Amino acid sequence: MSEITAKLKFTQDTLIRLTGKKVSQKEIKDHYLKLLSHLKHKKTLMIAGSQGSGKSTLSVLIKKFFLKFYSKNVVILSIDDFYLSSFQRKRLARKFNTDLFETRGVPGTHNLKLLYKVTNNLMKKEFPVYVPVFDKVTDNKKNYKRKISKVDLLILEGWCVGSKPVSYTHLRAHETGY
């Protein structure tokens, strides 16, 4: 089996397992394999998109593909694992008189200092690196952390990746109590 045929089959089989849907080999060749080839020598990748748009699916496909064909270790960080605790978000909501911060998701509800620390340590290869794991059922971090000891490609995925929160001054000046 040629390398291109192996990559086509692997990608198609992986997408079926991840999504339950069959993607044509033409679409895989024209889109997925081009993207995967383009990423081969990258060290970092940010994937942003709305909820349910396929960020996690694409991240897992990249991880599996890179391990199989390039022997590279891909680490996937989800911005979701860096949410502030429920208590911290409620405190922000009271402080700024808006319930926007009570729910997860909007810019300003993540622990960006910890995210920067973790990503910097991963990029500097200061292993091991411990990554928080957020439990959406309890709306708080789990009691354990994921241990990472190697990274060749770091993927950060989330729906507001790179978005900046509205300034606190602006929020105070435009209090509406949403």
What does each model-identified segment do?
Residues T169-T176:
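Conserved small/polar residues in nucleotide/adenosyl-binding loops
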Residues L58:
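Hydrophobic positions on the alpha1 helix immediately C-terminal to the Walker A/P-loop
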Residues L84-P132:
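Conserved nucleotide-sensing/catalytic segment adjacent to the nucleotide-binding pocket
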